[in-house]
């Protein structure tokens, strides 16, 4: 079914068939011929926004039955039952002259972390200063983007299959990851420069454990 909305309340229902490669694979390292059922997902979403105050909040819940995923051994698997994922988020942007402070916080709960792993808390921040270098000709943004999430077993990547699998060995999180950036807009041209992980080595915590 297609999405349908009533104001700021939405409902969506999807029924997804497994791909050919999810059911059939023959390679040097992996071989399987696994008939899979269709996934069924029902999702409800509510959203509230106040544009004049640059504020938005919302929540959504999705229930997926017969979820198809790649297990810790990278073999395809199908969950016998339903998994529920609930998310609550808030976004608030502040502006003081040319200073922009954009903030977004997300809370998530999964009823089965081995099937749908998610961090409990995630935060996304973008702080930058915007100003004219040459009025109506060249404009600059200089700032930092930051990301943070609590520890969880983030999916690992298997290059032999080109898929992400649900590993249960290494927890990722409890570490602020920051990028410095400069963006210039000159007439119709945009130039973007980024220095990734600018805070590397500043904290004793390990990013991947």
Predicted regions and their residues:
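Exposed, low-structure sequence patches enriched in small/polar residues
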Residues: 1-209
């Amino acid at each position: 079914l297609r999405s349908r909305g009533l104001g700021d309340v939405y409902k969506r229902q999807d029924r997804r068939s497994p791909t050919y490669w999810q059911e059939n694979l023959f390679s040097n390292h992996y071989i399987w011929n696994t008939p899979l059922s269709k996934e069924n997902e029902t999702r409800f979403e509510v959203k509230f926004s106040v544009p004049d105050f640059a504020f938005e909040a919302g929540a959504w819940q999705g229930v997926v039955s017969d979820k198809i995923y790649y297990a810790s051994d990278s073999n395809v698997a199908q969950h016998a039952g339903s998994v529920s994922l609930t998310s609550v988020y808030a976004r608030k942007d502040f502006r003081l002259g040319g200073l922009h402070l954009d903030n977004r916080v997300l809370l998530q709960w999964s009823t089965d972390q081995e099937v749908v792993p998610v961090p409990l808390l995630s935060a996304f921040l973008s702080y930058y200063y915007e100003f004219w270098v040459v009025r109506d000709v060249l404009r600059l943004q200089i700032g930092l983007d930051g990301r943070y999430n609590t520890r969880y077993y983030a999916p690992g990547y298997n290059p032999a299959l080109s898929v992400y699998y649900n590993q249960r060995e290494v927890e990722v999180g409890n570490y602020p990851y920051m990028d410095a950036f400069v963006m210039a807009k000159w007439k119709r041209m945009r130039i973007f420069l980024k220095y990734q992980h600018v805070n590397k080595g500043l904290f004793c915590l390990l990013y991947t454990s």
